[in-house]
Structure formats: structure tokens, C-alpha cells
Curated annotation (Swiss-Prot):
It is an enzyme of class 2 (transferase). This is Adenine phosphoribosyltransferase. It is found in: Cytoplasm. Keywords: Cytoplasm, Glycosyltransferase, Purine salvage, Transferase. It holds the Pfam family Pribosyltran. Gene3D superfamilies: 3.40.50.2020. It catalyses: AMP + diphosphate = 5-phospho-alpha-D-ribose 1-diphosphate + adenine. Its EC number is 2.4.2.7. Catalyzes a salvage reaction resulting in the formation of AMP, that is energically less costly than de novo synthesis. One of its GO terms (biological process) is purine ribonucleoside salvage. It comes from Lacticaseibacillus paracasei (strain ATCC 334 / BCRC 17002 / CCUG 31169 / CIP 107868 / KCTC 3260 / NRRL B-441) (Lactobacillus paracasei). Belongs to the purine/pyrimidine phosphoribosyltransferase family. InterPro entries: Ade_phspho_trans, PRibTrfase_dom, PRTase-like, UPRTase/APRTase. One of its GO terms (cellular component) is cytoplasm. The gene is apt.
Amino acid sequence: MTINFKDYIASVQDYPEPGIIFRDISPLMADGKAYAAATDEIAAYAQDKGVEMIVGPEARGFIVGCPVAYKLGIGFAPARKKGKLPRPTVKASYDLEYGEATLYLHKDAIKPGQRVLVCDDLLATGGTIAATIRLVEQLGGIVVGTAFLIELSDLHGRDKIKDYDMFTLMSYTGA
């Protein structure tokens, strides 16, 4: 059975501000079969890449990455916001519309040479995922791919990660 994943995405007009269409993954997660199918597709991609560790940025990267790691029997490392990780970390910053944000990863999360898949729910401008990739590479990990439920292609996030293989379940154009 083939699933049209877009059937499980709620498109919310003018959220969080006028002119934006918010792509809500909650209905996908609420449907066990659709969520499992999405996880299975990303896991198959990861397995083909020989992935040894999954890294996902806070917070929805956890929703995507953890079940994939579980399915493959490999580890998951969270890239978190400031003050959320208790042991020594590395950090990488990225630009926001107004300002800057920083992600952190435990220094021992990735072993040098480890094959890593970076997962998130959505690729928009690419800043978050590019920072997550930098964290992995600071620790000597090899990013063998990136995976997303959704790509917002008009925002050109793909350009920021053009040197990395990318897998996405669905793509949207428009705000």
C-alpha cells in the first residue's frame, strides 16, 4: 500500500503570521500507519547509506530521528538549545530572521569517522540543518545524508546543504 503523505499534513493559512502557510505534521504523527510508513522510508534510506548514528535538532528532529534510530537499532544524538545538555558540548550558530540561534551537541555524541544521518521534520531555509551538520563535523563525524518529512522548496534550504545527499518524503511550493 502506497501512502500519500501529504494527506496527513494540515496546511494552516496565516500561521504564525499573515502570508505564511504552516505545514503541521501532527496528523501524520497521530496516524500510526502513516507515521510508521514515514519512519520506514527514512530508515530504508539510512540503511542504504550505512548510517551508524542519527542526529536531530531540537525539537521536531527528535520526532523524526528517534523512531528511525530505534528501527535501525542505532543511536540518536540530540542537537539542543543552550542550557539543555549537562556535559561538555560543541556549538554551532545560525542566523534567524532577527538575530541568531545556537545549537549544542555533547562532545562525546559522535565518534570520529562515524557515519551520521541528520534528520528533521522540515527543511525551510536550511540554517538549522546546516548548523547541525557543522556540529557533527566538529566531532569528526561523516554526514552521509540528510532526511526530512517536508521540504519547502521555495525557501531554497537545499542550497545551504548542497554538498550533502538529501532525502525528503514530500515537497511544497508557496509560502
